[in-house]
């Protein structure tokens, strides 16, 4: 009942990042979070089992939603009494995503950002910038986000639990959600207006202006809105229905950067 209540919040206060710290490592709780996320255009940050890599991968395999983002292991933090204690990662990851949204924009991945207030991951996760055969990359390969130690404790992982590769990246999923939500909110004025040529042109241009603004911010690579005449038939308009299509291309995170080294003798002639 508590998780279901998240979908009852007012539209201007909708939660875009859903968590149940210390509970979402249980599948029933995670499923409930994902169900609400699906209805509210949110993402659910899911705590992993915090045992070993294989258990984390097995847990991730139980989900097939582009709105689920699984993080493992848990984190070790300093308690108020000075002792060390385990903490499920979802709350700090949610805070990191919100911070990234505010400082950089919703179209950026939260991966490779430092998680503050953390001593270390609950178990060591091997990682090296020039080594693909590490635990961190192994977990990422199976769409489990994790933490690596490099100038702080960093969140490491871009991928949701999507079965459709178009929505594999968390930042792409969230970019689509934010665009859809923004357009719906911005066009409340258009509901119940008379459907005229001017009306169709005005709505289309407002959407295109918004997409141009996003492109100028590098939030998308491009986009376009149009009113499809095959859908906007005389009968549809007579029934009070009008259709606006739009497309866009989201930027994709540089998950793997490959530098290829070539030793050549071509520049020897520059000696003289």
Which ranges hold each PLM region?
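A glycine- and small-residue-enriched flexible loop/hinge signal that marks low-structured segments
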Residues: 1-185, 224, 228
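Composition- and surface-driven signal marking solvent-exposed, interaction-prone regions
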Residues: 32-34, 203, 224-226, 240, ...
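Glycine-rich loops and low-complexity Gly/Arg-rich segments
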Residues: 41-46, 174, 207, 249-252, ...
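Acidic, low-complexity glycine/serine/threonine-rich segments
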Residues: 168-230
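C-terminal edge-of-domain segments
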Residues: 231-272
């Amino acid at each position: 009942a508590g998780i279901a209540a998240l979908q009852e919040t007012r539209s201007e206060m909708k939660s875009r990042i859903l968590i149940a710290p210390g509970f979402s490592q249980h599948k029933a709780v995670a499923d409930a979070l994902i169900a609400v996320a699906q209805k509210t255009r949110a993402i659910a940050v899911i705590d992993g089992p915090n045992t070993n890599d294989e258990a984390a991968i097995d847990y991730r395999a139980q989900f097939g939603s582009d709105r689920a983002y699984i993080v493992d292991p848990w984190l070790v933090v300093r308690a108020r009494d000075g002792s060390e204690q385990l903490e499920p990662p979802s709350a700090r990851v949610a805070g990191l995503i919100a911070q990234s949204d505010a400082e950089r924009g919703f179209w950026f991945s939260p991966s490779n950002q430092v998680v503050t207030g953390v001593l270390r991951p609950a178990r060591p996760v091997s990682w090296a910038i020039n080594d693909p055969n590490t635990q961190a990359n192994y977990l990422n390969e199976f769409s489990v986000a994790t933490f690596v130690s490099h100038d702080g404790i960093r969140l490491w992982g871009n991928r949701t639990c999507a079965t459709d590769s178009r929505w594999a990246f968390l930042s792409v999923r969230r970019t689509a959600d934010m665009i859809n939500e923004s357009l719906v909110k911005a066009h409340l004025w258009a509901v119940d207006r008379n459907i005229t040529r001017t009306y169709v042109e005005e709505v289309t241009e407002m959407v295109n202006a918004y997409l141009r603004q996003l492109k100028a911010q590098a939030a998308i690579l491009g986009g376009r809105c149009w009113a499809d005449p095959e859908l906007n038939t005389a009968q549809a308009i007579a029934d009070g229905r009008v259709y606006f299509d739009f497309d866009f291309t989201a930027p994709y995170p540089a998950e793997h950067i490959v530098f290829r080294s070539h030793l050549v003798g071509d520049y020897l002639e520059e000696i003289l």
